[in-house]
């Protein structure tokens, strides 16, 4: 079954399967299923066309998903960088934005280590 351009895994519960769509987490998935009148434990393969259509309609009218959500996220980060605020500068320099330490750790954000040659020790005469 496809929702918002994403193939949902048929063997998973509806709540978990909906989280495969970018922009829908567990809480959103539960509220979508509740509004559609579908039990969260039902598997995607058990849903009929009418129920799938109800889910698609709810998502289309109330949620920003996939490309729209990603684009909005990128625009928000770009805005921070353009106005030159502290968070924008951290994004621009590829450093952690939320106050984490960087002397050690932060490898995920900073990337692989760039080795800098150390000073050579003077030899004794």
UniProtKB/Swiss-Prot annotation:
Transmembrane segments: none annotated. It comes from the Bacteria. Part of the 30S ribosomal subunit. Forms a loose heterodimer with protein S19. Forms two bridges to the 50S subunit in the 70S ribosome. It comes from Chlorobium phaeobacteroides (strain DSM 266 / SMG 266 / 2430). GO terms for molecular function: rRNA binding; structural constituent of ribosome; tRNA binding. The lineage of its organism: Bacteria, Pseudomonadati, Chlorobiota, Chlorobiia, Chlorobiales. Located at the top of the head of the 30S subunit, it contacts several helices of the 16S rRNA. In the 70S ribosome it contacts the 23S rRNA (bridge B1a) and protein L5 of the 50S subunit (bridge B1b), connecting the 2 subunits; these bridges are implicated in subunit movement. Contacts the tRNAs in the A and P-sites. Pfam families: Ribosomal_S13. GO terms for biological process: translation. This is Small ribosomal subunit protein uS13. Residues 107-125 have a biased composition (Basic residues). Keywords: Ribonucleoprotein, Ribosomal protein, RNA-binding, rRNA-binding, tRNA-binding. One of its GO terms (cellular component) is small ribosomal subunit. Residues 92-125 are annotated as: Disordered. Belongs to the universal ribosomal protein uS13 family.
């Amino acid at each position: 079954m496809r929702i918002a351009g994403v193939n949902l895994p048929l063997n998973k519960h509806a709540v978990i399967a909906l989280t495969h769509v970018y922009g829908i987490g567990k809480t959103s998935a539960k509220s979508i299923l509740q509004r559609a009148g579908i039990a969260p434990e039902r598997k995607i393969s058990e849903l009929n066309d009418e129920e799938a259509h109800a889910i698609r309609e709810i998502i289309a009218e109330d949620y920003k998903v996939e490309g729209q959500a990603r684009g909005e996220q990128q625009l928000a980060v770009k805005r921070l960088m353009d106005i030159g605020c502290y968070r924008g500068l951290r994004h621009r320099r590829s450093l952690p934005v939320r106050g984490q330490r960087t002397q050690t750790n932060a490898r995920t954000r900073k990337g692989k280590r760039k080795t800098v040659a150390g000073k050579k020790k003077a030899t004794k005469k």
